[in-house]
Amino acid sequence: MEASATVERAAAKDVLTIREVLRETWHDTYASLLPETAIETITSQWHAPALLADQIQNPDIYFAIARDGGVVAGVVTARKEIDAIVVGRLYVRPHHQRRGIGRQLLESCYRAFRDAQKVRLTVEADNRKGVAFYTKQGFREVARSSEEIAGARLENVIMEKPL
């Protein structure tokens, strides 16, 4: 099913709803990959309302939401780094997935940084849905990395797509 969502820049009034979207999708995506305590620690730190509000206000960060039927269904953040768009986060609520909303959010990043030559992102290697989605969007693996977050070890795939 194709999306009927509208993508718009996030506003300060959206912070609590954005936090809810991020928490919901993090729990859905990572429940089988990370301990619950790690998910709670990460979501409380990375998705703190003050941090999200600062990112929304930062002119160097593209922060957008997708509304589907009036409901915030997805979130994307990106920034420009030399000739590349670096996607920091892209999450779509579980019951809104497979409708083209993720693609719409990605494409909005391309429009926000029209002079970029490529787009880069990092996805957890065991996040099969995420890796499959990005592969379908034309991304290819260019490197791997690992990191420890909240006591959990994550193996990451760094993916790029030429524009």
Question: Where do the protein language model's features map onto the residues?
Answer:
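C-terminal "cap" of GNAT-fold acetyltransferases
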Residues: Q55, K118-V131, T135-L163
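Short, contiguous strand/loop micro-motifs
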Residues: I39, Q117-K118
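Residues forming the Rossmann-fold NAD(P)(H) cofactor-binding site
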Residues: R103
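Acetyl-CoA-dependent GNAT
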Residues: A5, R9-K13, R19-Q97, L106-A112, ...
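Conserved G/P- and acidic residue-centered "switch" motifs that form tight phosphate/ATP-binding loops
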Residues: G100
